[in-house]
Amino acid sequence: GLKLAVLSNKPHKQAVHVVETIFGKETFQWIQGQIDTVPRKPDPTAVLQIAEKLGATPEETLYIGDSEVDVATGKNAQMHTVGVTWGFRGKEVLEDAGAELIVDSPEEIMNMIED
């Protein structure tokens, strides 16, 4: 089935608190902020570790993000990259970063996954 994770460059405790406050504790199977022993994005180490913990290969993983750092992280991990326009950066920045797909709403992602 579909598994969801969050990887943030924000401090770990802050990332977990924000995500669980907004989405609840059951939405994501993994939430990870910056941990001192793991390199920051766009280094792929953390996202590859998370994918492995969730039983996913890079080839079957969508890395969804709102910045050029997110696109670079996904590409560095050999994952499919989706840029979202409702976050930190706009469409042009995501296109320039090389996102495979750019979407304007969460519904577009769900429709893509369901197809």
Q: What are these model-predicted stretches?
A:
Residues 1-3, 89:
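A generic structured-segment signal
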Residues 3-5, 80:
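Proline-centered loop/turn at the N-terminus of a beta-strand
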Residues 8-10:
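Conserved phosphate-coupling serine/threonine residues in phosphotransfer and NTP-handling enzymes
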Residues 12, 16-115:
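Asp-based, Mg2+/Mn2+-dependent phosphohydrolase catalytic module
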